[in-house]
Amino acid sequence: MARPLQRPAGLGPFVLLWLLLPAPSGRGVQAGRAWPVPRCPAACEPTRCPPLPRCSVGTAPVLDRCGCCRVCAAAEGEACGGPLGRPCAPGLQCLAPRAPRLLGGRPLGTCGCPAAGATVCGSDGRTYRSLCALRAENRAARLRGALPAVPVQKGDCGDPGTGSAGWLRNKFNFIASVVEKVAPSVVHLQLFRRDRSPLGSEDVPVSSASGFIVSEDGLIVTNAHVLTNQQRIQVELQSGVQYEATVKDVDHKLDLALIKIEPNADLPVLLLGKSSDLRAGEFVVALGSPFSLQNTVTAGIVSTTQRGGKELGLKDSDMDYIQTDAIINHGNSGGPLVNLDGDVIGINTLKVTAGISFAIPSDRIRQFLAEFHERQLKGKALSQKKYLGLRMLPLTMNLLQEMKRQDPEFPDVASGVFVHEVIQGTAAESSGLKDHDVIVSINGLPVTTTTDVIEAVKANDSLSLLVRRKSQTLILTVTPEIIN
């Protein structure tokens, strides 16, 4: 009887498992051999890093895959990846071939420029498919001892440097497009006063303002409060050309004025948009020349399109102002407030405090211009009007609290009209009125709104003002000017 075959003790089932596995050839074993990959140290110790070899020309040392030791980066066309994870030089990618080679069980690739990228123009006049391609060309140029090219602009060399229309800079720089369209029609106003002395007379600059062109033959809209009687008005265009201007129409209730210059050629004009279509939250741009700095631009959003005059304390006013947080400074008055289409939707008028500014809606400007043209057609002369020379606000509770916060010595009053600004060279300045005064009464009658002041000016040739200034109580006499 044949004895059963005995398997050696200790082999257990491993022999059977080995017998079930196919026997690989020697070549296959070598190709599938797993090379050990060094582990990254728990803590980086640069003192234990191997010496850095001399890197090839055009490449710089980079950190290894562990982020600890410096190694030579692979240049374009050199191998990358592998068991040690050799990195490519900055700007290059490790591109794996369709049939990747394996080293130590890890794929090997070749460093190269990424396929996608914006074209750039080099100083050598050549267009490169990407900034990476230009740098790669520079590395090759250094090896040849040639002069490397410098990137001079984005886009092709034939482009004027604006770049691709899809770039974020062009896509979202909508305000720059508005300014480019509007700025040529915004003008700077310089107002002069004639000072007479025994030695002669001279024109002294007293204030500056802004305006915008509404007709090709030189009609310009600005604020009424920036104009004073017997002043010379000089208008400077964006090109730097200067003209003398004459006043054509003034409406102090609307705070609008129309002046005229005689240009040598047609001027660029701004179109009036419909302020009634404006929505709260829209972007707006304010242009002007505050502090005589031409082409000053601020941007903001519309807080409300109908800040009623009655809400501001103007009980007899039917004006609805545009409130915005676009900055309006001294000298910015009279400049346009435009929407993103470049249409005028208001005229910059007043800044109450930081982040709160007001503009007269363009629908009122359109009405003002229509009435002027109607008078021109009928041949009516411009009537004479009285002018005090103030920018004022009703002293509401909110304004009183804000002024108390800014100036602890602000007068302790319950009502009145706040003098925001005294225009230089006017009757108001001659009377002794100053900025931040509070007019309490005129000719013995209390005033609480700007309309009260306007009606008093119309009805009287001489005004006796009861004024509070800090802790002082003053009585000032003023005679309004007569202007055309």
Swiss-Prot record:
One of its GO terms (biological process) is programmed cell death. Pfam families: IGFBP, Kazal_2, PDZ_6, Trypsin_2. It comes from the Eukaryota. Residues 390-472 form the PDZ domain. It is found in: Secreted. Its EC number is 3.4.21.-. The keyword Transcription does not apply. Its main location: secreted. Residues 209-369 are annotated as: Serine protease. The active site is at H225 (charge relay system), D255 (charge relay system), S333 (charge relay system). Keywords: Disulfide bond, Hydrolase, Protease, Secreted, Serine protease, Signal. GO terms for molecular function: serine-type endopeptidase activity. Disulfide bonds join C40-C66, C44-C68, C49-C69, C55-C72, C80-C94, C88-C111, C113-C132, C121-C157. Residues 36-114 form the IGFBP N-terminal domain. GO terms for cellular component: extracellular region. Residues 1-28 form the signal peptide. Residues 105-159 form the Kazal-like domain. PANTHER family: SERINE PROTEASE FAMILY S1C HTRA-RELATED, SERINE PROTEASE HTRA4. Belongs to the peptidase S1C family. Serine protease. This is Serine protease HTR4. The lineage of its organism: Eukaryota, Metazoa, Chordata, Craniata, Vertebrata.
